[in-house]
Every structure is written in C-alpha cells, then in structure tokens.
C-alpha cells in the first residue's frame, strides 16, 4: 500500500466528474487500500478518489474513533435524503479550513463494497454528512461551493499561502 498525494484547491482536477467503476477487480481494490492508507496518514475521516487524482466513483470513509470501521462506497447512488443539519466541515483538499455547510440529516444510499457486492445503507449524523461531502467530490463539488464568493476567495487565499509555506519547508 502507498500514501497518495492529495490535491489541494485551486487544482482544477478536483473539479473533474468521476466515471463509474466498470468492474471491481484487484486494481480497484489496490486503489481502495491506498486511499485508506492516505486518509489515515492525513488524519481524515473520508476520501474520494477525485482527491487523489483518480477519477472513478470510489469513496472510503471511517468516522469511528478507533479508526477500525472502514466503509467502501464504489459507484454510490443517493436514494433518499431527509431532514436538515449542518456542522463545520473540513476537507483534506482544503487544509486547515472549516465552514458550516447545510446537509441532509439522514441519507439512504446504494453502492458496491470492496468486493463488488451491492448493498444499501441508511446513515445519519456524522456518517451521513461525510457521505454527502465525499459524494460531492465525485461530481467536482467542494464544500466551499456552498459558501459566499467572498468566503470562498478568503479560503482559497489561505490555502494557497499555506501551500507556499509548506513548499519552502
């Protein structure tokens, strides 16, 4: 397994729409494993393949405190959503920035697991929010897209400054 490079805004590759996975095979499973390793190394709770410049409909999530409840969503589809909630969200592609984002309180999805088996899942709370956040990535949408243009600009400037500082280190 390897840790992959996470793209940061304003990288336009984050805006690409991911293509469906045609077959879950050893290559897809390797991508899933690398994505988990990357997500854990970056101390995230979710990662979409788009964020590591792989433009396929793959998401990995682990919102557990012990980091031992892996969830793989291949070709996820949103079936239902209900209620309204919102928390301050962060994103590995928008480091050290957070903002309040409106989300559905509950979701029901259909996806394939790491072995290609179909399943449905009903989620609420942090898991529901994380699923929605990561599914947005698959269509080229970022949490900052929910914010005012001024807030978007401020966040972009902060991330660009942070990336410049990290490049010098």
UniProtKB/Swiss-Prot annotation:
It catalyses: N-terminal N-formyl-L-methionyl-[peptide] + H2O = N-terminal L-methionyl-[peptide] + formate. Binds 1 Fe(2+) ion. Fe cation binds at residues 91, 133, 137. Its EC number is 3.5.1.88. One of its GO terms (biological process) is co-translational protein modification. The keyword Iron applies. The active site is at 134. It comes from the Bacteria. The keyword Iron applies. Its cofactor is Fe(2+). Keywords: Hydrolase, Iron, Metal-binding, Protein biosynthesis. InterPro entries: Peptide_deformylase (IPR023635), Peptide_deformylase_sf (IPR036821). NCBIfam families: pept_deformyl (TIGR00079), PRK00150.1-3 (NF001159). Removes the formyl group from the N-terminal Met of newly synthesized proteins. Requires at least a dipeptide for an efficient rate of reaction. N-terminal L-methionine is a prerequisite for activity but the enzyme has broad specificity at other positions. Belongs to the polypeptide deformylase family. This is Peptide deformylase. It comes from Salmonella arizonae (strain ATCC BAA-731 / CDC346-86 / RSK2980).
């Amino acid at each position: 397994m390897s840790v992959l490079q996470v793209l940061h805004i304003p990288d336009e590759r984050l805006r690409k729409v991911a293509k469906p996975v045609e077959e879950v095979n050893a290559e897809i499973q390797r991508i899933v494993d690398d994505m988990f390793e990357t997500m854990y190394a970056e101390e995230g709770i979710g990662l979409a393949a788009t964020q590591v410049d792989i433009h396929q409909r793959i998401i990995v999530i682990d919102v557990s405190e012990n980091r031992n409840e892996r969830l793989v969503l291949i070709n996820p589809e949103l079936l239902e959503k209900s209620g309204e909630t919102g928390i301050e969200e962060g994103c590995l592609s928008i480091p050290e920035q957070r903002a309040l984002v409106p989300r559905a309180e509950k979701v029901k999805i259909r996806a394939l697991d790491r072995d290609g088996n179909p399943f449905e899942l009903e989620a609420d709370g942090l898991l529901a929010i994380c699923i929605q956040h990561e599914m947005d990535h698959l269509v080229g949408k970022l949490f900052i897209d929910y914010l005012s243009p001024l807030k978007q600009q401020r966040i972009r400037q902060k991330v660009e400054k942070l990336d410049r500082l990290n490049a010098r280190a």
